Amino acid sequence: MKLQLIIPFSFLISYVSAHTIFMKLQSGGTLYNTSYAIRTPTYDGPINDVTTEYVACNGGPNPTTPSSNIINVVAGSTVNAIWRHTLDSTPANDATYVLDPSHLGPVMAYMKKVTDATTDVGYGPGWFKISEQGLNVATQGWATTDLINNAGVQSITIPSCIANGQYLLRAELIALHSAGGSQGAQLYMECAQINVSGGTGTSTPSTVSFPGAYGQSDPGILINIYQTLTTYTIPGPTPFVCGAAQSTAKSSSTSTAKPTSTSTLSTSTVTKTSSSAVASGTGTAAIYAQCGGQGWTGATVCASGSKCVVSSAFYSQCLPS
């Protein structure tokens, strides 16, 4: 059975050019230097397997560099996570300096209370979601598009009711342009090391584990986005809100939230063209899905009408033959 997909033209010409990294944090009016108190990789690739430990703070195929720094953050304040295509990308040297516009999906943030943010491994239990934005059903607009239009600034409000102390702050986005095939969703995340002060400590959030919070077949992970969607279920638990009943259940998103920053970036109009793809079966990767790369454990045989094309040591993709 064939699935009719609408593939953005921009994706056809730049399918390998638009990974991304959370590489700076702004707090209390201070924009810290690249990689300051953030475990950043030098390579901007994704994590595709949600069952690995690397889904917490990156690593594995994208080795991260430890940081001995911690950023002070006031509970109840808003911090800004800054995303860039690479650690060196700027508007002057990179046309897709945040993320390629074809990489559509949700944007989220999590926190984890730790004893020492500089040494905690990140993976395991203790994570709670504090913000999310997915699909605006009315406009069919995605959170990643808003992130690009906001110059890569993800605004995150730190809950005022949590306990003081050190935390890992996990900023994440998921690119769903290849999510119709097994392990096709591309997860991008880094962890910042922060120290929270001014919190009331009146609430203890319910938590989830990374890995564990996401499943490879979750409806927000395995999905064909090239259709009109009436709903989209953002992966993971519902965000923690001070004073609200707590739950770790997933919920459908019809998000209309916008970033709080007023920074904007003009983007060109995306032209769509019709195409078709074969749904992936056992051992077969769909057209436009990943088919290889360092650490890749999914299908390496492409669906009929496509071939596996190597773009780097870390990423290969099924493209029309």
UniProtKB/Swiss-Prot annotation:
<dbReference type="InterPro" id="IPR000254">
    <property type="entry name" value="Cellulose-bd_dom_fun"/>
</dbReference>
<comment type="similarity">
    <text>Belongs to the polysaccharide monooxygenase AA9 family.</text>
</comment>
<feature type="binding site">
    <location>
        <position position="177"/>
    </location>
    <ligand>
        <name>O2</name>
    </ligand>
</feature>
<feature type="disulfide bond">
    <location>
        <begin position="161"/>
        <end position="242"/>
    </location>
</feature>
<keyword id="KW-0119">Carbohydrate metabolism</keyword>
<protein>
    <recommendedName>
        <fullName>AA9 family lytic polysaccharide monooxygenase C</fullName>
        <ecNumber>1.14.99.56</ecNumber>
    </recommendedName>
</protein>
<keyword id="KW-0732">Signal</keyword>
<comment type="function">
    <text>Major lytic polysaccharide monooxygenase (LPMO) that depolymerizes crystalline and amorphous polysaccharides via the oxidation of scissile alpha- or beta-(1-4)-glycosidic bonds, yielding C1 and C4 oxidation products. Catalysis by LPMOs requires the reduction of the active-site copper from Cu(II) to Cu(I) by a reducing agent and H(2)O(2) or O(2) as a cosubstrate.</text>
</comment>
<feature type="signal peptide">
    <location>
        <begin position="1"/>
        <end position="18"/>
    </location>
</feature>
<keyword id="KW-1015">Disulfide bond</keyword>
<dbReference type="InterPro" id="IPR035971">
    <property type="entry name" value="CBD_sf"/>
</dbReference>
<dbReference type="Pfam" id="PF00734">
    <property type="entry name" value="CBM_1"/>
</dbReference>
<feature type="binding site">
    <location>
        <position position="186"/>
    </location>
    <ligand>
        <name>O2</name>
    </ligand>
</feature>
<feature type="disulfide bond">
    <location>
        <begin position="57"/>
        <end position="191"/>
    </location>
</feature>
<keyword id="KW-0964">Secreted</keyword>
<feature type="binding site">
    <location>
        <position position="103"/>
    </location>
    <ligand>
        <name>Cu(2+)</name>
    </ligand>
</feature>
<feature type="glycosylation site" description="N-linked (GlcNAc...) asparagine">
    <location>
        <position position="195"/>
    </location>
</feature>
<keyword id="KW-0325">Glycoprotein</keyword>
<dbReference type="GO" id="GO:0004497">
    <property type="term" value="F:monooxygenase activity"/>
</dbReference>
<dbReference type="InterPro" id="IPR049892">
    <property type="entry name" value="AA9"/>
</dbReference>
<feature type="binding site">
    <location>
        <position position="188"/>
    </location>
    <ligand>
        <name>Cu(2+)</name>
    </ligand>
</feature>
<dbReference type="Pfam" id="PF03443">
    <property type="entry name" value="AA9"/>
</dbReference>
<dbReference type="GO" id="GO:0046872">
    <property type="term" value="F:metal ion binding"/>
</dbReference>
<dbReference type="GO" id="GO:0005576">
    <property type="term" value="C:extracellular region"/>
</dbReference>
<dbReference type="InterPro" id="IPR005103">
    <property type="entry name" value="AA9_LPMO"/>
</dbReference>
<dbReference type="GO" id="GO:0030248">
    <property type="term" value="F:cellulose binding"/>
</dbReference>
<keyword id="KW-0503">Monooxygenase</keyword>
<keyword id="KW-0560">Oxidoreductase</keyword>
<keyword id="KW-0479">Metal-binding</keyword>
<feature type="domain" description="CBM1">
    <location>
        <begin position="283"/>
        <end position="319"/>
    </location>
</feature>
<keyword id="KW-0186">Copper</keyword>
<dbReference type="GO" id="GO:0030245">
    <property type="term" value="P:cellulose catabolic process"/>
</dbReference>
<keyword id="KW-0136">Cellulose degradation</keyword>
<feature type="glycosylation site" description="N-linked (GlcNAc...) asparagine">
    <location>
        <position position="33"/>
    </location>
</feature>
<keyword id="KW-0624">Polysaccharide degradation</keyword>
<feature type="binding site">
    <location>
        <position position="19"/>
    </location>
    <ligand>
        <name>Cu(2+)</name>
    </ligand>
</feature>
